[in-house]
Each structure stands twice: as structure tokens, then as C-alpha cells.
Amino acid sequence: MSIVTKSIVNADAEARYLSPGELDRIKSFVSGGERRLRIAQILTENRERLVKQAGEQVFQKRPDVVSPGGNAYGQELTATCLRDLDYYLRLVTYGIVSGDVTPIEEIGVIGAREMYKSLGTPIEGITEGIRALKSGASSLLSGEDAAEAGSYFDYVVGALS
């Protein structure tokens, strides 16, 4: 839930107007909106490269997943792995734009860990891929922007771990 929605829900539950502190937090959130949009745009424009590089890093670190019998063995399964990395990158951009993890929770990570376990997919490979996406994204962003984006990548890793 965004800071705007959370503040309104809290104020309404108490049948009161927004407090000066809540208004200041909303003002800060809104003023950071342009920066969040810029970060999401950079990640979106570079998504193919980020996903490809992250996949290569995972496959290099974990050759077992691309070897016969591995979860990413063969062109089709490798493409599925890269599709999943792209999916998590997209979720991260949703979180960045909204300034909140709610879209990540509601759209994508609830039940994902259980799904991967039922498919026999090693969670460590997925989380390594997400960390590689974070590293690639950080190289495209300034320090403050990288920290902002990094918190959403970290959230996804934590939710899947």
C-alpha cells in the first residue's frame, strides 16, 4: 500500500484529516515520483540486456542447471528461466514506480516459492538471478537510484528465500 493510500486509510479510520506529518510524507513521496519513473524507465529500456547478463551469470555459476537433467537444460527451459528473470525485473519496476512492495506481493511472489519447489526448481538459482539483475541495474544507476531499486530486488529475494 502506497504512503498516500496508507495515510488516507489511517486518517479515515480515525475520522480525521491528514496530519501535517502525513502531508509531509505524501509531499516527499510525490516529489520523488519523477525519480522513481526515471529509474523504472532505465531498467525497462535495458531489460533485455539485464536479463541476458543475469542469465549468463547464473548459468556460469551454476552449470548444473544448464547441464542434461538441469532445470534450464535445452533451449526451451533456458528461455523459461530467462522469462522468469524478466518477470521479476518487471515486478521490481512496478514496485519502484509505486514506491511500495504491494504490487510485487500481490502480482508475483505470493506462492512463487511453493511453485518452484513443486517443480523442483532450485530457489537458489532464481535468487542468484535476481541478485545478478540487481547488480546489472546498479551499474546503470547513480548511487541513490541504485539503492532505491536495490531495495525492491532485495525484497523479491527475501520473499522467495
UniProtKB/Swiss-Prot annotation:
The keyword Thylakoid belongs to this UniProt entry's keyword annotation: yes
Q: Does the keyword Cell inner membrane apply?
A: no
Q: What induces it?
A: Constitutively transcribed in vegetative cells, not expressed during hormogonia differentiation in red light.
- Which keywords does this Swiss-Prot/TrEMBL entry list? Antenna complex, Bile pigment, Chromophore, Electron transport, Membrane, Methylation, Photosynthesis, Phycobilisome, Thylakoid, Transport
Q: Where is this gene product found?
A: Cellular thylakoid membrane
Q: Which residues are involved in binding (2R,3E)-phycocyanobilin?
A: 81
Bilayer topology:
Peripheral membrane protein
GO cellular component terms listed in the entry, alphabetical order: phycobilisome; plasma membrane-derived thylakoid membrane
Which sequence positions carry the modification called N4-methylasparagine?
Answer: 71
Question: Might you name a Gene Ontology BP term for this protein?
Answer: photosynthesis
The principal localisation class reads membrane
Alphabetical list of Gene3D superfamilies matching this protein: Phycocyanins
PTMs?
A: Contains one covalently linked bilin chromophore.
Family recorded in the similarity comment: Belongs to the phycobiliprotein family.
Per UniProt, subunit arrangement is: Component of the phycobilisome. Heterodimer of an alpha and a beta chain.
Mind telling me what this protein is named?
Allophycocyanin alpha chain 1
Q: Which gene encodes it?
A: apcA1
